[in-house]
Design a protein with these regions (language model features):
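Short Pro-Gly-centered flexible turn/kink motifs
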Residues: 272-276
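N-terminal signal peptide c-region/cleavage motif recognized by signal peptidases
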Residues: 16-18
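Bacterial N-terminal signal peptides
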Residues: 6-14
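Positively charged n-region of N-terminal signal peptides that target proteins for export
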Residues: 1-4
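Extracytoplasmic
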Residues: 21-267, 279-282, 286-421
């Protein structure tokens, strides 16, 4: 009994601590709408330079319990300045007024929200101040209460959705001289790269670069293993441009390995199937020419994007894959989804083999920070989806099979490389 009395204050203290346990969600993990670049977002300072009262700040996370949810906001305001803010969780909104204290942060509590159904929730912060009266610099959103227990949020400054990949197994001993894949974008947020034909030395696909520009990208890595600066790559390790198509830009790339980059600005259409082909032609025991071809929907013919001579090769295509990437991060809350279908490989002697099996993988962000990443089969094609904060996920390494089409790409009237630019 004496022991229990001795432990009682400790037990009560632990219970009190547990009841006050909080989830601190950094401001740098939030998204901005309608302009994803409408304020400055950084890991060091949170959200600053928020001027436009029409701008909304959004957090997304999974609440695993129903019940009361207490929310507060940590921010900075000039001493004596006031700011009125509205926080909306689901369909419920609360407003609060805060007075600044200069360089010190202040906490603005909102009335409790009721979470009726567990699952992903959107937290929308709005300024109710008139134009010209900034709402303050936002540091964090704080959650407490029964509904916050075991909540899952991305707490890292990286706001990108997880990158997702299809890995295609090839029969053992098969030399792959060509890799063909069809790709249909179903969603088209800015800063999306849907990559159709990847292999051990490069990748080929299409990007959404701005509201007015889209590109077809074909890139080939150098040898030597340099991670960032192509200026450090010795001449014998550099890939060399052999040819490029009409209107194609060709140059260097770095910071994700180094190599030769090429792109064609072209307004490919969401919802329409695009066709991609990569070929490998060994020229001697140590060099292979890799070429990327695109079936141009307007010209109704195959066009060359570019060809690169890669050193320390001499073989064919290996490690075939496709991927979808959110390369911007500022709109990582939006869903990206595309269909990948009718994959074929061609051997050096001209035999076509259909690839109907693929396995799923994702980058480190998909391990724990962002679980909204998926692969499956839809309308007879593989699909990749990531972002959107939708429930569920696909396990790493899961294998899928699609129905065979039996339709090999036999219409390959490819342009003569010697006639290319």
């Amino acid at each position: 009994m004496r022991t229990l009395l001795y432990l009682l204050p400790l037990i009560l203290a632990c219970c009190a601590w547990e009841s006050k346990a909080q989830v601190r969600i950094p401001a740098c993990t939030a998204y901005l709408e309608p302009d994803p670049e409408g304020a400055r977002v950084s890991a060091r300072s949170g959200i600053t330079r928020w001027q436009d009262p029409a701008l909304k700040v959004l957090w997304f996370g999974e609440l695993k319990h129903s019940g009361a949810l207490e929310c507060s906001l940590v921010l900075r305001l000039p001493a004596g300045a006031e700011s009125r803010l509205r926080l909306t969780v689901g369909d419920e909104s609360q407003e609060a007024l805060v007075r600044g204290s200069g360089t010190n942060t202040v906490a603005i509590p909102f009335n409790a929200f009721n979470i009726a159904t567990p699952g992903y929730q959107r937290f929308k912060l709005q300024s109710l101040n008139p134009p010209g009266k900034p709402p303050g610099d936002i540091e964090a959103l704080i959650l407490q209460g029964p509904a916050s227990q075991d909540a899952h949020f991305n707490l890292k400054a990286r706001r990108n959705a997880a990158s997702v990949h299809l890995m295609y197994p090839v029969p053992t001993g098969t030399n792959v001289a060509a890799f063909y894949c069809e790709l249909t974008a179903l969603e088209d947020p800015l800063w999306t790269y849907y990559m159709a034909c990847g292999w051990h030395r490069g990748y080929f696909g299409m990007q959404v670069n701005s509201p007015t520009e889209r590109r077809l990208i074909f890139s080939v890595w150098d040898s030597g293993g340099e991670a960032a600066d192509r200026g450090k790559v010795n001449e014998e390790n550099r890939v060399k441009l052999e040819a490029k198509g009409e209107g194609v830009f060709a140059g260097d790339f770095g910071n994700e390995g180094t190599g030769g980059h090429s792109h064609l600005v072209y307004p490919w259409k969401t919802g329409e199937t695009q066709r991609f082909l990569v070929t490998a032609k060994p020229v001697d025991a140590a060099h292979t020419v890799f070429s990327g071809y695109y079936f141009h929907p307007d010209k109704r013919q195959w066009v060359l994007i570019s060809s690169w001579k890669a050193p320390k090769e001499g073989g064919y295509l290996r490690g075939l894959y496709s991927f979808s990437e959110d390369f911007g991060g500022a709109n990582g809350h939006l869903r990206r989804k595309a269909l990948y279908g009718n994959q074929w490989i061609r051997t050096p002697d001209g035999e076509w083999l259909e690839l109907t099996t693929a396995s799923f993988s994702h980058d480190p962000t998909g391990r724990a920070d962002r679980l909204d990443r998926f692969m499956g089969v839809e309308n007879g094609q593989f699909f990749l989806s990531h972002g959107g904060f939708v429930p569920g996920s696909t396990p790493f390494g899961e294998k899928f099979s699609r129905p065979a089409t039996g339709k090999a790409p036999t219409d390959l009237k490819l342009p003569d490389l010697s006639a290319a630019q």
